[in-house]
Amino acid sequence: MRIRVLLLALILIGASVAYPHGQRSVSGPGPGKIFFYTAKKFGVPILKASLQFENGLSGQGKSFYQVRLQVSSAALGVLFRMNNRFTSTMEAETCVPVQYVKEIDQEGLFKEKKNYLETLTFDPNHQRVLVEKKGDQEIREVSVPAETFDPLSMFARCYLKEDLSSHRDIRMTIYDGLRLRQMVFQPKQEKIKTRIYGEVEAVRLEATTSFASFENKEGVIRIWYTDDGKKTPILMELDLPIGSVRFELDEIRES
């Protein structure tokens, strides 16, 4: 299994950023929450993930939210070690991203060691993203549509802003520093069995996308939210060319 592809798919479904004119804590979309997930393959845990929605920040006359994702390896020993972190800072009103920070730290017995920090700065006024990797002199400029999301701000928009009960398709342009994707998430209401809640009514968002690591073969991303007004993201499934993996919700904590 290619862990890198699993990680890319996870951050598609789903470090503080400093502002030069100062910042302060402001009210976010309710108390901050941390969602903890486990991904298993053949019943064995392979990845642990935590997804945290932070209360907003305020600076330069605007309010912002932050979403943080941490993904680590589970019980893989010397075969593979991962401790990757991702942070998205976005405008509170629209969830349009301001910055997306990737901190990659992983290595394995048969994998190349990767340790780098990359910052994506979104500039919707000029329809571009500036990509800067720590230690590199060059700053890449990538042209994107005005309303382009990173993977975490996409997740936040679905969680905080979208009316999933309308069952309308959600169309988004997403850029993660690797490639620009046009994705359509199709909602569907259904009952599912969950680890911590039992059987619940849920809304499933489903989108098809291609994966460069599999010769651009298509895979499917599914996210289930509880259909109870809270929209708790209880399950994420990756249907990849190499098979399916599920990230199930284990626990929710207040931050």
For the regions a language model picked out, list residue spans one by one.
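Active-site/ligand-binding surface loops and adjacent short beta/alpha elements
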Residues: T121-I174
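Sec-dependent N-terminal signal peptides
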Residues: V5-I13
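Acidic, serine/threonine-rich low-complexity disordered tracts
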Residues: H21-P124, K161-S255
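C-terminal segment of classical bacterial N-terminal signal peptides
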Residues: G14-Y19
